[in-house]
């Protein structure tokens, strides 16, 4: 069941990257979140602790939800269609993706 949920989230992330506006990378994510921009932050499961704390701190100040994904940064990069690791990403516009619904449902169920 959990694997199915991860696949749904992965598909939603990819759809958001392809059809919406997504910022990749922890530095750029923090920069945008500090200005209160964005709808959702997605963090890789192996993001360094200091970066995780920074992103979560600024996201909380800006009232932007944070989703901690179970996959590694290399896998998150692959989900985004990139040949490099992605430790954090920020969804500015989800496009045709249902990522916001999936994350809300998943957080409500846990």
From Swiss-Prot:
GO terms for cellular component: cytosolic large ribosomal subunit. GO terms for biological process: translation. GO terms for molecular function: RNA binding; structural constituent of ribosome. Gene3D superfamilies: 3.30.1330.30. The keyword Ribosomal protein applies. Keywords: Ribonucleoprotein, Ribosomal protein. Belongs to the eukaryotic ribosomal protein eL30 family. NCBIfam families: PRK01018.1 (NF002172). HAMAP family: Ribosomal_eL30. This is Large ribosomal subunit protein eL30. It comes from Methanocaldococcus jannaschii (strain ATCC 43067 / DSM 2661 / JAL-1 / JCM 10045 / NBRC 100440) (Methanococcus jannaschii). The lineage of its organism: Archaea, Methanobacteriati, Methanobacteriota, Methanomada group, Methanococci.
């Amino acid at each position: 069941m959990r694997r199915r949920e991860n696949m749904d989230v992965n598909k939603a992330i990819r759809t958001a990257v392809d059809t919406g506006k997504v910022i990749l990378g922890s530095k750029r994510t923090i920069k945008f979140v500090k200005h209160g921009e964005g709808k959702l932050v997605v963090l890789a499961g192996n993001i360094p602790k200091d970066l995780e704390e920074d992103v979560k701190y600024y996201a909380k100040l800006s009232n932007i939800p944070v989703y901690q994904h179970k996959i590694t940064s290399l896998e998150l990069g692959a989900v985004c269609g990139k040949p490099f690791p992605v430790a954090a990403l920020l969804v500015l516009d989800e496009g045709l993706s249902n990522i916001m619904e999936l994350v809300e449902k998943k957080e409500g169920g846990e």
